[in-house]
Structures are given as C-alpha cells and as structure tokens.
C-alpha cells in the first residue's frame, strides 16, 4: 500500500496490518486517522503524523486487537523479540527517524544464512517506497543498523509514547 499524503505513513502502516489479518473492510487512511486523539493543546499541536499513542488509538478504535508496544518493554526490544513476533505471523509496526520520522511495517527477517547478526536484514512494507527503481512497497534494511538508529531523537514527548524504539504489534484478540 502506498500512502497518499506526506503525513499518512502511520495510518497506512496500520492499514497494512489490518489487511494482513483480513480485517481491512472499509477502513482507509482518512477513517483510521479520525480514530486518533487530537494533539491540540499539546506541544505537537498541528503535527499531522502519528504518535505511538495515536497508533494505539487506531487499533483500539477498530476493536478486536491485542496490542503489544514500546510501553510494554521499558528496556527496549532487540532482534530476537522482532524475530519472535514474525515467527508467530505478526507484523511489527515501527517508527524511527527514516525520512525525519516514518512508520514502516517489518514483515520479514533474513539471517543471510550466517550465525552473526551484523549481516541480518529486515524486510519492511514501506508505504513511502520511492528510493529504488521498483516501487513495489518493500524495502530491505540492515537489521543492526536500524536497531542502533531506532529513535525519533526526542521528536515525541513521553506523554505521547516517547521517541525511542517505537513499535506496535497488533494481532486479533484471542477469545
């Protein structure tokens, strides 16, 4: 899925997750964006993008999802955490400083057939895939490099979920 505006990577990442689970229905960027709480009256007033708390709002608004996020991992996550969720068939939404702030969805992990992690890569669904000759919506990132730069460098306040290691794993609620 390609985002239709400069600010909509967060809601488009959520759309990708809904689509992955067959829960897309009639949801679109605009309807998901409307589920986010307003940032009016905060230091982010006028910011059109999506904070972690707003991403959580989206899945709570859609309903029927269990959510694991940065808030559940105060000491951060690492490669084995992401690999575990992927092994369970759960895509991992991440927000980091790519493009000055960008949500993407990790959908795969490749060890490159080695024991070391320094050559491992993430496969991401990227709604702003404009940097290669094949706008297919996918990207490949060195896994350790992304993890060591997995920050918004103070762009979001703690009251909105913070700025470091922002991730969200939404999966259909059990039971």
Region locations from a protein language model:
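Generic ordered-secondary-structure signal
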Residues: 11, 15-18, 24-26, 36, ...
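Active-site-adjacent substructure of cysteine-protease-like catalytic cores
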Residues: 71-127
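Short, exposed beta-strand "edge-strand" segments with a Pro/Gly-rich flavor and a Y/T-containing core
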Residues: 23-24, 43-50, 76, 114, ...
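Generic detector of ordered, mature protein regions
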Residues: 13-14, 20-22, 30-31, 95, ...
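Cysteine-nucleophile protease catalytic domains, especially the papain-like/related folds used
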Residues: 1-73, 156, 162-165, 170-175
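Short, surface-exposed, charge-dense and proline/glycine-enriched linear segments
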Residues: 55-66, 99-106, 127-137
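Noncatalytic regulatory segments and standalone regulatory/sensor domains
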Residues: 109-175
């Amino acid at each position: 899925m390609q985002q239709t505006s400069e600010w909509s990577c967060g809601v488009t990442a959520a759309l990708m997750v809904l689509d992955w689970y067959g829960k897309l229905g009639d949801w679109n960027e605009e309807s998901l964006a409307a589920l986010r709480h307003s940032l009016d009256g905060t230091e982010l007033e006028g910011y059109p993008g999506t904070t972690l708390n707003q991403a959580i709002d989206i899945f709570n608004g859609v309903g029927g999802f269990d959510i694991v996020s940065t808030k559940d991992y105060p000491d951060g996550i690492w490669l084995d955490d992401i690999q575990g969720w992927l092994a369970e068939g759960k895509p991992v939404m991440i927000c980091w400083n790519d493009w000055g702030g960008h949500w993407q969805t990790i959908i795969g992990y490749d060890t490159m057939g080695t024991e070391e992690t320094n050559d491992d890569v993430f496969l991401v669904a990227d709604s702003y895939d404009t940097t290669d000759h094949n706008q297919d919506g996918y990207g490949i990132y060195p896994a350790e490099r992304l993890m060591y730069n997995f920050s918004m460098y103070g762009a979001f306040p703690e009251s909105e979920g913070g700025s470091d290691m922002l991730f969200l794993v939404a999966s259909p609620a059990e039971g």
